[in-house]
């Protein structure tokens, strides 16, 4: 079920009503009905769409609450300064789960997300469970039907479980099994968060991955080169971040809190090798769970990641 954006979420400190250099995002955001959006001849600006769904988390035996994530992130983002002076910033609202099967909600989200991807230079998709990634892939493939897609996931988990239905832990297996013209790179894998069968599947499918342990102090030149080579080798990049990759000291409000997780600045450093590329079709950020957040710490962290990713 799709609902348009809620203006009441977008509030913040008012420094000026006339000087754009003092504006914050709540002063520049607009709202549109994404279901009625016509294709633009020239993509521009930024589109935001929420995936207010945690059904996949529940099916994956995780702790629920991430369906409230998109609104919490938008509220935190609203008060940040508009340093980029975006020519267009549109909150398209959220998609909610009201179907019998999760896959039907994913397909509904994908149809709408594809419109934003086709119409904007940047599209941010806010979760919600990490089953958003499969929906993001469907949207990407709709916009780019023949191009090679490189999927980059900053995550503690492979999320390549073999299940009978979509869950927050199956997205990337679904992608790899359905589409031979995709490859998968995972940054931040937790050795204690993935079974041997998942490592075996990664070997079988030639999934490139980097352990979290290799990223705790710095991002080495070897890893930077790996990312840049992966970006170079693909026509389109689908970029996604699962917030459970970040240590719970910084991100307590997630579906599965991390022990020995990454520092936020490490995630930013990794993203610097990805975001500047014009190949990035969209960015999704998943598993922000307000139910377990402290002082809105995790919502603010996601909001600041989006803020840093604006270009």
From Swiss-Prot:
Mn(2+) 1 binds at residues 130, 155, 159, 242. One of its GO terms (molecular function) is manganese ion binding. The lineage of its organism: Bacteria, Bacillati, Bacillota, Bacilli, Bacillales. It catalyses: N-formimidoyl-L-glutamate + H2O = formamide + L-glutamate. This is Formimidoylglutamase. The keyword Manganese applies. Catalyzes the conversion of N-formimidoyl-L-glutamate to L-glutamate and formamide. Keywords: Histidine metabolism, Hydrolase, Manganese, Metal-binding. Mn(2+) 2 binds at residues 155, 157, 242, 244. Binds 2 manganese ions per subunit. It is an enzyme of class 3 (hydrolase). It comes from Staphylococcus aureus (strain NCTC 8325 / PS 47).
């Amino acid at each position: 079920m799709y609902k348009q954006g809620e203006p009441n979420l977008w509030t913040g400190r008012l420094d000026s009503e006339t000087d754009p250099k003092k504006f914050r995002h709540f002063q520049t955001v607009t709202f549109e009905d994404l279901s009625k959006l016509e294709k633009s001849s020239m993509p521009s600006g930024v589109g935001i769409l929420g995936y207010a769904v945690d059904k996949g988390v529940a099916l994956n035996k995780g702790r629920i609450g991430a369906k409230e994530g998109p609104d919490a992130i938008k509220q935190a983002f609203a008060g940040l300064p508009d340093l980029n002076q975006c020519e267009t910033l549109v909150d398209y609202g959220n998609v909610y789960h009201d179907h019998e099967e999760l896959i039907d909600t994913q397909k509904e989200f994908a149809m709408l997300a594809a419109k934003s991807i086709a119409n904007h230079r940047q599209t941010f998709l806010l979760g919600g469970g990490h089953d958003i990634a499969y929906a993001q892939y469907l949207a990407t493939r709709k916009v780019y039907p023949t191009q090679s897609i490189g999927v980059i996931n900053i995550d503690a988990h492979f999320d390549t479980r073999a299940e009978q239905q979509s869950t927050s832990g199956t997205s990337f297996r679904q992608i790899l099994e359905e589409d031979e013209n995709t490859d998968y790179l995972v940054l931040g894998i937790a050795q204690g968060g993935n079974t041997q069968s998942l490592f075996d599947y990664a070997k079988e499918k030639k999934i490139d991955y980097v352990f979290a342990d290799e990223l705790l102090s710095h991002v080495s030149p070897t890893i930077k080169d790996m990312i840049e080579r992966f970006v170079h080798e693909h026509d389109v990049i689908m970029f996604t971040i699962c917030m459970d990759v970040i240590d719970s000291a910084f991100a307590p409000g997630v579906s599965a809190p991390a022990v020995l997780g990454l520092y936020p600045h490490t995630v930013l450093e990794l993203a610097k090798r990805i975001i500047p590329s014009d190949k990035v079709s969209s960015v999704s950020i998943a598993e922000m769970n307000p139910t377990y957040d402290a002082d809105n710490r995790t919502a603010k962290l996601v909001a600041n990641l989006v803020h840093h990713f604006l270009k």
